[in-house]
Amino acid sequence: MAGNEWINGYLEAILDSHTSSRGAGGGGGGGDPRSPTKAASPRGAHMNFNPSHYFVEEVVKGVDESDLHRTWIKVVATRNARERSTRLENMCWRIWHLARKKKQLELEGIQRISARRKEQEQVRREATEDLAEDLSEGEKGDTIGELAPVETTKKKFQRNFSDLTVWSDDNKEKKLYIVLISVHGLVRGENMELGRDSDTGGQVKYVVELARAMSMMPGVYRVDLFTRQVSSPDVDWSYGEPTEMLCAGSNDGEGMGESGGAYIVRIPCGPRDKYLKKEALWPYLQEFVDGALAHILNMSKALGEQVGNGRPVLPYVIHGHYADAGDVAALLSGALNVPMVLTGHSLGRNKLEQLLKQGRMSKEEIDSTYKIMRRIEGEELALDASELVITSTRQEIDEQWGLYDGFDVKLEKVLRARARRGVSCHGRYMPRMVVIPPGMDFSNVVVHEDIDGDGDVKDDIVGLEGASPKSMPPIWAEVMRFLTNPHKPMILALSRPDPKKNITTLVKAFGECRPLRELANLTLIMGNRDDIDDMSAGNASVLTTVLKLIDKYDLYGSVAFPKHHNQADVPEIYRLAAKMKGVFINPALVEPFGLTLIEAAAHGLPIVATKNGGPVDITNALNNGLLVDPHDQNAIADALLKLVADKNLWQECRRNGLRNIHLYSWPEHCRTYLTRVAGCRLRNPRWLKDTPADAGADEEEFLEDSMDAQDLSLRLSIDGEKSSLNTNDPLWFDPQDQVQKIMNNIKQSSALPPSMSSVAAEGTGSTMNKYPLLRRRRRLFVIAVDCYQDDGRASKKMLQVIQEVFRAVRSDSQMFKISGFTLSTAMPLSETLQLLQLGKIPATDFDALICGSGSEVYYPGTANCMDAEGKLRPDQDYLMHISHRWSHDGARQTIAKLMGAQDGSGDAVEQDVASSNAHCVAFLIKDPQKVKTVDEMRERLRMRGLRCHIMYCRNSTRLQVVPLLASRSQALRYLSVRWGVSVGNMYLITGEHGDTDLEEMLSGLHKTVIVRGVTEKGSEALVRSPGSYKRDDVVPSETPLAAYTTGELKADEIMRALKQVSKTSSGM
């Protein structure tokens, strides 16, 4: 216990406090606190049990030293001896209780992980057995061979990479559009405020540099980095700019258009005037999705005109960074039908386990603070949709992603083996994990080779107070003003003052090692601060502890800790440390990667780093430093002293780092990245070739516009009266201008071509159109009211809502003319049509019917959606769109097995064939008490490699499973992408309760009217299990995009709510 005298004093005070066994603190008696022999007594020797000794042993073994120190300070602050004795007695047992609680939590954590691994093994066996049914005996043996461990990482990498063609200049003719997403933090290209808060750190720097580097690769035309737009007065105005150009890209000067290069695109979501922490952004992510979708569609059209020969250039890949952006990327990828890539950066399950082990917060407190369960679900959803997951290290794959339901290393190998043989995986899928270390921009790195000699930087730093000192970077002077002898080698640490960065242990190691103190200085770059009191509690606590340790060890003149630095100063800080022949250290408890280690190596600095995480791979690749146990301050001090004192070792580590640093360059990273993405199954919407380019569509639109002109000209006043619903809407188009445009088109064409005369003749006597009227709608009213009876049949209230919505919209003739209607329901088409017939509502009054919980989309009144018998058939392009990773039989068999009774009392569900279709497996719920929640079902399906969308619907009487890309909310985005109806121009009419997918529909840029009193109950109770994320993590509690009806179910009340939501949303 050398160097921890205060602990000895604390324990002696406990033992000398003259407490006795009769009190709550029981256990008198003195004795040596360092002797554990009296810590416990055999059972039955109750009078010999000494709780003080037992407490001492428990404290020494299980309580964090810094916490104990703070407690001791509070104790000795009391002057009155009697009060001090009482407080000491109480705290004695309080800390002992906390120590026991911590051990209990550790045991629970071990049991939880053990149970999870056991379940994973069982699931893996079941999945392998299911998959092996259609394999021959030889193939089964090959599959088992796939599960055998590979001898070396290098061999595994070569095997996986051998089938791919490395990206090269041969791809220069390609004009790719790449989308990167990083939602949270403050993101800009210049003067990045890294360290300003916990959301603006290394990830911001990483994504900005990745965007720049990717745009310079051959074949890449444009890179968009999406982030949140922040127009708060608390931050710089630049974060409110919609677009910021990062660089011109590799196509600059080639005359290929004006949109090439790399850009930051800022998308508004949530409160426009507030900068929100990432934990508060979850309810607004769907707004971000809709805003990003609108930009991508506009940009795709513009790029098509520039480099795509008139055909839209959709993103080559959509890449989400962190859990929130992974959630966004999954939805965008599904809406656009393009591949998705994920980089986790920091993972929620790993953080949850670490926080639980610390024992300072319960799981409920952790979730309340960090929204950890919503973050984990975002990561699971991103795994569902990802083609590729990029990690920095092998450790991240094995020890972090392995904790997730959606990834299993062994099952992934089995599925990959089947895919190579062309054998069906029955809808099971695991994303491919690849290690691609982050890159670094070396363009501004200046390495002075003269450091290898005996020269020093005396000329650079001498005479700071002289009349004409040699010019030096300002940050050098800021650092050296702390130091008595600035000529000593510098030990440099650069990180936020976060507890997990372990800065306090570094200061202790430096303070307690006299040879190290005499030989070197310590420089701590701990973010930026103005006032410690204004910092977050965790960061302030770390910084305060550091200052106290500096005072305790009297390190004044040996430790520098400047308050401010900017991004441009960071290379100069590295350069100063290298000139001083110093060492860079990263002592973090766990480091996912360690980008600062790469930066330090590029400037010629040897490194000392934690042995937990990414630094292991970095030191193996660069061979330029030492690894240490971050909990062992003696090991940290020894490693630093070894590098600083041994000149030959220092020079060798420096040379090795500079020689191998090219492995972490951005061009190398991007080349590997594009090679891997090229190996993904690229997909694009099939309908891009079909509409609206064909002649039939042009002719039909011309005729429809002509009829519109005649009709509108009769109904519009000379003043161009506007609809009351759109008075304040910036997206409103003046009908008078629209008429003028149509009349101009008519005048420009003196006569119809012969081929159009027959179409005109048919059009005058028929309501059938070749293409849906959706493509001409300016407004779309989506009725998604889940009104069902106890047996799951639609109630009359659903009909009443439909009729009143029609009356409300028709009351404004201008609005009705430019508006369309869609009915969105969990019912199959047959029951939907029966309901409409019952209410005498023609199906053709709807532009689209979304049926089967989003598994099918129909267009009544559209010729292309009618079969030979005149019956409606679903949109075939939509069915192709959602078929990705879908197996009807695999989902049906697995759900039936999971819902089967374990006690022999009968199954909880039976298949509902009438409600099922090729992309929807429907089950009738027989016993609601036996069914599992959506959370539980999703977890079990993911563990088996099945990626589906699960929902309970129709008053909890049905369980419906549809493809991952299908849902009622995603069907609306499909309509937006397919037919050009802006999501911002959609009005969703729904009830207070509904199916379990209602939450997904309430968020987004569309306007929502919630009709009170029409749904008494829904299926929401089956959404989540206890301990899961909350509804407020999905749906914003307050938003200008939603309004409630207040009175009876009447058209006037619905119109009032529509006007209200239009007015409030227009002010956003």
UniProtKB/Swiss-Prot annotation:
Report the gene name.
SPS
Please tell me the species this chain comes from.
Answer: Zea mays
Supply the name of the protein.
Answer: Sucrose-phosphate synthase
Which InterPro entries has this protein been placed in?
A: Glyco_trans_1, HAD_sf, SPP-like_dom, SPS, SPS_C, SPS_pln, Sucrose_synth_GT-B1
Q: Where are stretches of biased composition, namely Gly residues?
A: 23-32
Q: Name one GO molecular function term.
A: sucrose-phosphate synthase activity
Positions of region (Disordered):
18-47, 118-139
**Stated role:** Plays a role in photosynthetic sucrose synthesis by catalyzing the rate-limiting step of sucrose biosynthesis from UDP-glucose and fructose- 6-phosphate. Involved in the regulation of carbon partitioning in the leaves of plants. May regulate the synthesis of sucrose and therefore play a major role as a limiting factor in the export of photoassimilates out of the leaf. Plays a role for sucrose availability that is essential for plant growth and fiber elongation.
User: Glycosyltransferase among the record's keywords?
Assistant: yes
Please state what class of enzyme this protein is: transferase
Give the metabolic or biological pathway.
Glycan biosynthesis; sucrose biosynthesis; sucrose from D-fructose 6-phosphate and UDP-alpha-D-glucose: step 1/2
Catalytic activity, EC: 2.4.1.14
The reactions it catalyses are: beta-D-fructose 6-phosphate + UDP-alpha-D-glucose = sucrose 6(F)-phosphate + UDP + H(+)
Cite the Pfam families for this sequence: Glycos_transf_1 (PF00534), GT-B_Sucrose_synth (PF00862), S6PP (PF05116)
Describe activity control: Activity is regulated by phosphorylation and moderated by concentration of metabolites and light.
Report if keyword Glycosyltransferase is assigned.
yes
Q: How does it assemble?
A: Homodimer or homotetramer.
Question: What does the record list as GO biological process?
Answer: sucrose biosynthetic process
Keywords noted in UniProt: Glycosyltransferase, Transferase
